[in-house]
Each structure stands twice: as C-alpha cells, then as structure tokens.
Amino acid sequence: MEIPENIREKLALFCNVRKSSVIQNLTADCLYAVPLMLEKEGLGREICNHLRLDSYIPDNTEWIEMIDNIRKIKKDEKVKIAIVGKYVRLEDSYISVIESLRHAGFANNVNIDIKLIDSETITKETAESKLKDLDGIIVPGGFGNRGNEGKIETIKFARENNIPFLGICLGMQMAVVEFARNVLGLADSNSAEFNESTKNPVIHIMEEQKKIYKKGGTMRLGSYPCILKQGSLASKLYGKEKIDERHRHRYEYNNEYKEILSFR
C-alpha cells in the first residue's frame, strides 16, 4: 500500500524535511527489486541534492535484466549445495559465499538450495547420511584446528563420489591434505599450522612469515600472480593461464610435494 499524499505531507511537516524527501519502501516480491523501487521514489536524487552533488539518471539495464531472470526461475529447478564449515550457527559468517552462490543461480536460471553443515558433525560414519544427494560441496576458509578432520572427511566423500567440490582458503589446503593422506598414502600428512611435528607438511608456513612473531595484522595480503596448469579446469574457467588473485594467508602449499601430487 502506497503512502497517501496527505500522509506524505504530514510526515514531511513533522520531520522537517521536504515532501520529496519522504521515501517509501514497499514490500517487494524480490529483494533485488528494492534498489529500483527506491530509485523510482527519487532516493538517489534526494541524496545528491542533500550532499550538493551532480545528479544523473543511472543505467540500470543490467540490474533490470537480472531481476527479470530471477522472476523467470522455476521454483522446482534447484541445485543443492552444501557449505561445510564450523561457523554455520551464524549464517552471516559465510555471507559472501552464500551471496555468490545465489548470484551464480541467477546467472544459470536455477534456485540454489544452500545447506549449512557443521564440519564437527562429519565423521567416517556420518558422512554419507549428511552429504548424500548433493549437487556440490564447498568447504570455505577458517582458522584453528577445530572441525578440520570433518572437513577432510567431507572432501574425501566428495572425491570418491564425484561430487563437484570447491575449497576456499583453508578448505583448499585441507583438500591437499586429504589427497596426500588417502591417495598418496602419506597417512600423517597435515598442515604445519596444526601439527608442527608432522613428517609430511604438505601445507607449510611461507618463507617470509617464519621470522614474524607478532601474529596480529601480519598475514600476506593483496593480489599475487598464479600460473594455472595448461588444460586444467581452472585455466578453462579463467580462460587464461596466468591470473592474479587476492590472498590473505600465512600458510601455503609446500612445493616440495609438487611433483608427487601433480603426477597423480
């Protein structure tokens, strides 16, 4: 229900603003339609006027097309994706991953049914019951040792059952550990971050980090180059073999294991 003009005038009077500055925010059938509704109400223009900035009409063509695509998606067209981590009690802990999945669904005209799973609940015995019938699994980043064995069991299940898998940050590091343990037979493989005495530290501390003792705010940050293997899935997705990606890490892949891991 739209605000009647007399109510708009009354709000403007008692709030000591111009009537054009009274902006209504109606209930929308799609969250992403709200910015367009606010633009139609003149919110952008009013903000520019208040801040004495030049105002212009934005080109929302791509945004409108995205919303049209969202509304065309059939409810029964779903892709089930699990996010397996240890911060799942607070969904916003993985908000960037969740939003990325939703936007991927918009681009591919499918609904993404996201299942948040606590990695501490994943064991050899529970993996099948918790991870079956999934179309994909994501193990995102995190800190500390808690829940890591569950992540490794998750990754093993995905590999053995041909479930598409994406490891992000610590998730990819645990994928290296899983492969080393269960495919290469290096049973005690681990990250040196969690087991400094492991005989097979397939993930180890970066050389430039070894002399850093103050841990707060000292990770390697920023964009770094990466060479992708020719013909690999990653190179096909990027469409090139040299990429630059942002990093925030203290530990990395141990290149002493490059040959044995690449061979398999």
Walk through the language-model features, giving the residues of each.
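N-terminal beta1-alpha1 cap of cysteine-dependent amidohydrolase-like domains
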Residues: M1-R264
